[in-house]
């Protein structure tokens, strides 16, 4: 039985062509570190790393200074570095009712440490209620953290309006782009985003364990480094260096991951985000259209492909969702993710808590035939 992979919201598979080979080549043929030695191979590795930073800035519309592109292990580490580096007891943080635990759990820790936290409400489709969001701002509000697209319903937030509201109140905006980066084009400067947190292993089609954040100088001035250690620069000082990106990159970087991510970014540039987005939206609309009229399921989020990414959650009203997910693999070879998707706030907003949903997430290699097979299986099992 052929497997149909529809769990790209968890991690993309397959990766962009050449990602694995680039990582293998680095490990087996290069293997050096950066900023730690002065021989030619390290200089070449540093140049390759710089190129990936430049590609990230270009992809996200972050300006021309690649030193503001910071590498971390992924979006979770990035969000922790932003939130815990920018906020102090007495400050006020705003998040939304659709956030992943990568935002909600750091927010809970910060609240226990004396930071006031507000959760902005969203409508039944998961879209932020902008008027109610703006009413939450106080003179002590320092940071708003919002996901761009939901990992449960695929809902895309109105980031332009969110950015404008934050700017109007002089509040920094950090964005969780885990389900947005690589799926559609956007410009963080035009959207007035101060820090964009990303992960390499989802829509960017890169490896696990590599991600980061791209920020502007406003965010840099507000941050205290969360992690301290060796950088290979200013080694005589016991303080973290003020220069970027070293200030936020203590320890040995994940160079195989960076090389793999670089290949993935070049693939996205060659194919074009607009082309990938059109294809994903066509498949998403096909999926949603094929399920309309089935009274035994509920699909939270926007009713059509407009306003969402290719993440489709299905709540089976007559069946146990976990059992359905098991049967999808056993009977049909369809791989999905069932449960709360590390996003209990989102499921509470969407009315699918505590049971959760069965999530189908489309990837860049998903075919019409695979979507049709999933539709038939859902109707069979509902």
Predicted regions and their residues:
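Pyridoxal 5′-phosphate
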Residues: 1-382
């Amino acid at each position: 039985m052929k497997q149909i992979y529809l769990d790209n919201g968890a991690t993309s598979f397959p990766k962009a062509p050449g990602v694995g080979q680039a990582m293998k080549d680095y490990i087996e043929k290069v293997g050096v570190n950066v900023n730690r030695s002065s021989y030619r191979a390290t200089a070449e590795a540093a140049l390759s790393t710089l190129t990936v930073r430049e590609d990230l800035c270009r992809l996200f519309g972050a300006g021309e200074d690649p030193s503001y592109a910071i590498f971390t292990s992924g979006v979770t580490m990035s969000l922790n570095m932003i939130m815990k580096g920018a906020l102090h007891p007495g400050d006020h943080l705003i998040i939304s009712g659709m956030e992943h635990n990568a935002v909600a759990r750091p927010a809970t820790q910060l609240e226990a440490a004396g930071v006031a936290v507000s959760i902005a409400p969203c409508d039944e489709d998961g879209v932020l209620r902008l008027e109610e969001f703006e009413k939450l701002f106080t003179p002590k509000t320092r940071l708003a953290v919002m996901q761009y697209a939901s990992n449960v319903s695929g809902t895309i937030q109105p980031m332009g309006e969110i950015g404008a509201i934050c700017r109007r109140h002089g509040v920094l905006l950090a964005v969780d782009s885990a389900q947005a980066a690589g799926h559609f084009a956007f410009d963080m400067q035009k959207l007035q985003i101060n820090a964009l947190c990303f992960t390499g292993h989802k829509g960017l089609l890169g490896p696990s364990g590599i991600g980061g954040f791209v920020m502007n100088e406003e965010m840099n001035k507000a941050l205290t480094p969360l992690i301290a250690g060796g950088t290979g620069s200013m080694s005589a000082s016991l303080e973290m260096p003020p220069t970027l990106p070293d200030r936020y990159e203590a320890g040995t970087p994940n160079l195989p991951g960076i090389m793999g991510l670089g290949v993935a970014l070049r693939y996205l540039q060659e194919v074009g985000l607009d082309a990938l987005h059109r294809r994903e939206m066509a498949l998403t609309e096909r999926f949603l259209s094929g399920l309309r009229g089935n009274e035994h399921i509920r699909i939270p989020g926007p009713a059509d492909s407009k306003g969402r990414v290719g993440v489709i959650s299905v709540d089976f009203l007559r069946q146990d969702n976990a059992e359905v997910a098991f049967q999808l693999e056993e009977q049909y070879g369809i791989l999905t993710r069932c449960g709360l998707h590390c996003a209990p706030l989102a499921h509470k907003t969407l009315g699918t808590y505590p049971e959760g949903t069965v999530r189908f997430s489309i990837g860049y290699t998903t075919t019409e035939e695979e979507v049709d097979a999933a539709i038939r299986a859902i109707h069979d099992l509902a």
